[in-house]
UniProtKB/Swiss-Prot annotation:
Cysteines engaged in disulfide bonds, as pairs: C49-C58, C52-C63, C57-C73
TM annotation in the entry: none
Expressing tissues: Expressed by the venom duct.
Protein name, entry field: Conotoxin Im6.10
MF annotations from Gene Ontology: toxin activity
UniProt entry tagged with the keyword Transmembrane: no
Domain notes: The presence of a 'disulfide through disulfide knot' structurally defines this protein as a knottin. The cysteine framework is VI/VII (C-C-CC-C-C).
Pro-piece positions: 20-47
Subcellular location: Secreted
Amino acid sequence: MKTGMIICLLLIAFMDADGSPGDTLYSQKTADTDSGMKRFQKTFQKRRCVFCPKEPCCDGDQCMTAPGTGPFCG
């Protein structure tokens, strides 16, 4: 009985005012993982360099392409 009451009080303590779970460790970890994946994808795409089609840019004549967009200097 006491264990159930303690669990219930802990759940209430971590809830926001609207009754949804607050900033728990799990939700923060998920957000950090998502931002880490996005950061990794950006750096991976920047390493994939091709020659610029029209004019030289940033590093000599190399520029970067992102899927769905044109070439850009990074």
